[in-house]
């Protein structure tokens, strides 16, 4: 975790998260859509009587999730890092979800009857039926909510649909952020190749 | 220096440019993805969007370096908002918003087609409206009534394929790969443009249709055996090119006459076509490097728009269709 004023946001999932953190203290958090994440950031800064130029570092969610959503966040981080000459760090959306619920397995809706989850710490896309977990494991994320009946039948514990643990919260991105550096080196986690690549592979 | 930073990511070129308020181009960086898409035989939106994300910050840095400028010299950010591939547009728009917001700069959201027209307003030979503009690219074929630099009115369009698309598809039928417009132009130079008669549909009004001529080429190719096809490829290319160019030229002149325009201009990638340049000799043409997608034209268009101050532009969305 980095000291100073840190803006974090994650636009990989349908509910985009942002947070403003100063020296580890959360000054504010927002949840909205990817397209509004910079407007949220502007709100957070104004609420604290601050401006973009006051930022010391950025943390951005790298997915997996919606391809377009991931890019909206990463393009914003690259533009902002360039504008302010500040470093950035990437944190996977799955890791941020898991951090909010220790021992929980993050499960993000990946569309096409699949979910994104972690297997041995690596992000993968799997059908819900293929998920491998001990009975009693807590599953969190919009994928866990979407496939609740079959996952619960397999022994998963899933908090109520409206529980905040199902949505990434950017305070956890700040908590997990390790290597700060050039924003261009923060890579998206797509997991899946473009369909066209598969078609000619 | 007081500069406009332009950013363009609507299709398969990632581009950044620095332009002065007087229309002087200080830098114009275009990272083309054509090679990346060649193996797919066309632009793949997801592949293009991924590449835009990789290139967006590097092209901005390169544009600044080439202009020997820093972000302190930039006082307006201009970005393409649409039309184009939505996922590709969003990369540029998101980066531009963040950059402008971070620097406390205003943002001008530019219509890509207005950008093509505004390529004519750049130094060293800026064009003053009124004029009739043929905008012909891989995605659009439009006849535009231009009365002021701040906009245009569309008076004709294609009802199916764009002219550039017709060239690319014809090139593919002739085994020239993708994108093949330029290769078709080169091959046509060795052929007889009267060898084959490829009819172009004549629509009422000022609209175009190029799907029929493409089908005619397909049938002509199928009617020839392999050896004969090889021998007559140049004739096919020349005749096909002649048919498309003739339709473009006729309609463009008719539109100019109807609207009382004394001057005709041509913008867009198809303006690079040698036969079009020769056939419409009276037309004003944008320099070749400004014909294809670039960011100098986006920065140029921004000079005639009212920019939005921060944070008003943060909720702006991209649009895919004109
Ligand atoms: Zn274009």
Q: What residue spans do the PLM features occupy?
A:
Chain B
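Conserved phosphate-binding catalytic cores of ATP/NTP-utilizing and phosphoryl-transfer enzymes
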Residues: 1-2, 110-132
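N-terminal beta-alpha supersecondary unit
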Residues: 2-83, 90, 112
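Short beta-strand scaffold segments in enzyme catalytic cores
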Residues: 14-19, 133-135, 141-145
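A contiguous, well-structured pocket-lining segment that forms one wall/lid of small-molecule binding clefts
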Residues: 70, 186-264, 273-279, 285, ...
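Glycine-rich beta-strand-to-loop/alpha-helix junction loops that act as flexible
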Residues: 79-82, 99, 137, 264-272
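Conserved phosphate-binding/catalytic loops in two-lobed NTP-binding clefts
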Residues: 109-110, 264, 280-298
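Glycine-rich phosphate-binding loop plus the immediately following alpha-helix
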Residues: 125, 148-190, 215, 219-222
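Glycine-rich phosphate-binding/hydrolytic loop that grips phosphoryl groups
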Residues: 287-322
């Amino acid at each position: 975790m980095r000291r100073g004023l840190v803006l974090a946001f994650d636009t990989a999932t349908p509910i985009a998260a942002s947070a403003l953190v100063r020296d580890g203290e959360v000054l504010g958090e927002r949840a909205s859509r990817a397209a509004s994440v910079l407007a949220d950031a502007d709100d957070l800064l104004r609420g604290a009587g601050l401006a973009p130029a006051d930022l010391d570092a950025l943390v951005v969610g790298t997915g997996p999730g919606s391809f377009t959503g991931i890019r909206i966040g990463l393009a914003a981080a690259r533009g902002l890092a360039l504008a302010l000459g500040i470093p950035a760090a990437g944190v996977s959306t799955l890791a941020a979800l898991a951090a909010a619920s220790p021992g929980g397995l993050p499960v993000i809706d990946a569309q096409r009857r699949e979910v994104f989850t972690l297997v041995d710490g690596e992000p993968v896309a799997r059908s819900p039926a293929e998920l491998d977990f001990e009975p009693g494991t807590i599953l969190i994320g919009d994928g866990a909510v979407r496939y609740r009946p079959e996952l619960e039948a397999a022994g998963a514990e899933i908090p109520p649909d409206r529980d905040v643990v199902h949505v990434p919260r950017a305070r956890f991105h700040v908590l997990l952020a390790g290597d700060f550096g050039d924003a261009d080196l923060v890579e998206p986690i797509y997991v899946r190749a473009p369909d066209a690549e598969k078609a000619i592979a | 220096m007081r500069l406009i930073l332009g950013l363009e990511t609507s299709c398969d070129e990632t581009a950044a440019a620095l332009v002065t308020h007087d229309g002087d181009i200080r830098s114009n960086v275009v990272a083309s993805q054509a090679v990346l898409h060649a193996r797919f035989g066309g632009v793949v939106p997801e592949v293009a969007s991924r590449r835009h994300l990789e290139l967006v910050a590097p092209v901005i840095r390169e544009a600044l370096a080439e202009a020997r400028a820093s972000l302190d010299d930039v006082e307006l950010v201009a970005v393409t908002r649409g039309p184009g591939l939505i996922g590709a547009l969003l990369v540029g728009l998101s980066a531009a918003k963040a950059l402008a917001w971070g620097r406390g700069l205003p943002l001008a959201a530019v219509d890509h087609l207005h950008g093509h027209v505004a390529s004519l307003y750049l130094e060293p030979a800026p064009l003053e409206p009124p004029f009739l503009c043929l905008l012909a690219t891989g995605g659009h074929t439009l006849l535009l009534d231009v009365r002021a630099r701040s906009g245009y009115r569309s008076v004709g369009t294609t009802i199916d394929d764009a002219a550039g698309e017709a060239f690319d598809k014809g090139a593919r039928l002739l085994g020239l790969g993708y994108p093949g417009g330029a290769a078709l132009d080169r091959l046509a130079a060795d052929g007889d443009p009267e060898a084959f008669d490829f009819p172009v549909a004549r629509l009422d009004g000022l609209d175009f249709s190029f799907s029929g001529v493409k089908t005619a080429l397909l049938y002509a190719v199928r009617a020839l055996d392999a050896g004969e096809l090889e021998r007559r490829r140049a004739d096919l290319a020349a005749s096909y090119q002649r048919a498309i160019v003739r339709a473009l030229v006729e309609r463009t002149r008719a539109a100019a006459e109807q609207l009382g325009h004394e001057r005709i201009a041509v913008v867009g990638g198809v303006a690079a076509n040698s036969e079009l340049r020769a056939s419409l000799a009276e037309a004003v043409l944008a320099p070749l490097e400004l014909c294809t997608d670039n960011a100098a034209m986006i920065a140029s268009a921004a000079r005639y728009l009212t920019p939005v101050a921060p944070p008003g532009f943060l909720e702006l969305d991209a649009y895919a269709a004109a």
